[in-house]
Amino acid sequence: MKNTTLIIFCTLTTFFSIAQNANQFYRKADSLYIIKDFKNSAIAYNEGIRLQGTTTGFIRYLSAASSWILANTPDSAFYLLNILSQNDKLTQSDYKNIESAKELAALQSDKRWKQLLAAVQKQADANTYPQEEFVYGRKDGMGLLMTQLKPKGKSNGKAIISVQAGSWFSNFTLVERGVYYKRQYLDKGYNVFMVVLGSQPRYAIPDQIEDLKRAVRYIRYNAKQLGIDPDHVGIEGGSAGGHLSLVIATADDKINVTASDPVDRVSSRVQAAAVLFPPTDFFNWGFPGAAMINVRGPQIQARVYGAFDFRVLNNTTAIYETVTDTTARNKIGKEISPIYAVSPDDPPIFIIHGDADMVVPLQQSQTFVAKLKEAGVTNKYIIKKGGRHNPDDMKPELDQFVDWFDKYLK
């Protein structure tokens, strides 16, 4: 048991998405910034950005530019920001953040500042697609939101649900950052629904599954108003989003025909799924018998404990109580592990997983695909050589997702 827990601990606490060398330079840059060695801080940031390449986030560029400004080297700050202004992941929020960033105030009197802002605005506009936000459900006095991204050209009338969840955290920032990865669908006429769920740590995985089912039903029920065909709905996601997508793809088609809300009287089934590096079996995490469902310490270290903090309402006290009974937790664990729900009537499923993934073991997709084959479910599986837990590592294979939906959402 000790060895099992240790392996799970090591797996869950590994860095998530970028090479450790880049992280080391960022940590060094942060430390140098604190002691006001701004020039060497900027140099360290630059090296981290160089190593991380095209996956470098907005905040790293901002930090590097800030250090160059404080080192009295505005030319280097403008150089970095001009690189950022050409980034095809830039959002409108990024533009607003650059425009108002106190760290960049010293550049605002420079004649190059307005040119920079214009370039950032132009790129952010080019990266944007028509969109509309909807409240797809309500709970605990709050609304559940989804954003419909619409193609700039003619719609093909088909829908792809994109599950916005990483480590079972879900928020609107993921929506903004995720538009870049949805271009392959939007440019071929798909409508993409970016679904935000009740997020951990407040809501656990079973709550998120119910939210996602509600989202599918909402889209299907309102298909005409949304401009899509209710019988051509696919689902996609990565990591936790991939896990939740597979839960939906393998779920049965139970419909509550007596539900008071008509939205809840329609199906939550999808017609195809495509996912990246998904967790599929919480009882065999990396190898047989490594159950992570009840290992609280490693879950806390990996910042996913809230996702497994199962709670039930005590109607007498009106208090949500944590489920601590092992038998009860194991029952829930099986219900949220899609590998145990695979059946011959499941829709076509496409999975890409890297063999260098140190967050979700490759074994999770291997055993799941074996189960799909055993059940006769149409599937496609790509093991990306050298691929880590990062969607950018999955290219160009990731671009095959749209072909999958083209084929199975006919």
What are these regions (language model features)?
Residues 203-224:
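Alpha/beta-hydrolase active-site loop
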Residues 199-200, 384-391:
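Histidine-bearing beta->alpha loop at or near hydrolase active sites
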Residues 217-292:
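Primarily recognizes the serine-hydrolase "nucleophile elbow" in alpha/beta-hydrolase
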Residues 173-193:
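Short amphipathic alpha-helix adjacent to the substrate-entry channel of hydrolases
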Residues 345, 350-353, 357:
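Short beta-strand/loop motif that positions the catalytic acidic residue
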Residues 156-167:
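Short beta-strand element of the alpha/beta-hydrolase
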Residues 119-154, 205:
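N-terminal cap/lid segment of alpha/beta-hydrolase-fold proteins
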